[in-house]
Regions:
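A structural motif
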Residues: 37-42, 128-137
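Substrate-recognition/cap helix-loop segment adjacent to the acidic, metal-dependent catalytic center
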Residues: 83-114
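Short, flexible loop segments at boundaries between secondary-structure elements
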Residues: 104-132
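Active-site catalytic microenvironments for nucleophilic, acid-base chemistry
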Residues: 91-96, 125-129, 163-170
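Short, well-structured alpha-helical patches and their helix-loop capping segments
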Residues: 56, 80-81, 110-115, 149-155
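Amphipathic alpha-helical interface surfaces
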Residues: 57-64, 85-92, 115-119
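Conserved non-catalytic scaffold segment of RNase H-like nuclease domains
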Residues: 1-82
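Acidic, Mg2+-coordinating catalytic module of metal-dependent nucleases/exonucleases
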Residues: 76-77, 87-88, 135-170
Length: 170
């Protein structure tokens, strides 16, 4: 993970803050060539953006943890698709914040509900579609215009936060 973006919202769409940070690669890590080829061809601006101003992962995750603790409760991670994003964030929490997690079951106080809320699954239910048929390119335009999907973590977080608020209020 080289970039992390998060938006704190409630059902009404009130924004409690945004968080964005670029992480330096983990020690002894190796980039996945398929992922890098995809970013270089599909989202080179996002790749260029997230490789600037990188900070060590432990420092980045501590900053993220500090930001989370300032937010009102309950804090529930939501993502699209959650199984992928949650896996990365959870791994980095365990790897770099284990000293802050030992005394808290299920990663509290960072998130009160684990694992993450899957926006894609919720959208499938609300829109009465099969999960496999749900993606950012086929949402009704009134829910999601897809023009802000830059693959920069913060832009995508804002985009999916907006989608979630709309879905929660259908």
């Amino acid at each position: 993970m080289i970039s992390l973006g998060a938006v704190a919202i409630n059902k009404k769409g009130d924004n409690f803050g945004d968080f964005e940070i670029n992480l330096a690669p983990m020690e002894n890590s190796v980039s996945d060539p398929v992922t890098m080829d995809w970013f270089n061809s599909e989202a080179p601006d996002a790749l260029n953006y997230c490789t600037k101003n990188q900070i060590p992962p432990k420092e980045a995750m501590n900053q993220f943890g500090d930001w989370l603790l300032k937010l009102p409760s309950p804090r529930i991670m939501a993502a699209h698709p959650a199984p992928i994003d949650f896996a990365w964030v959870n791994y980095y929490f365990l790897e770099f914040l284990h000293d802050r997690l030992d005394k808290y079951p299920f990663h509290e106080p960072f998130f009160q509900v684990m694992p993450a809320f899957d926006i894609k699954s919720y959208a499938a239910r609300v829109l009465q579609k099969d999960y496999a048929d749900i993606n950012r390119n086929n949402y009704p335009i009134e829910l999601h215009n897809n023009k802000n999907h830059t693959h920069k973590a913060i832009d995508d977080a804002r985009e999916y936060a907006s989608l979630l608020v709309k879905l929660l209020n259908i």
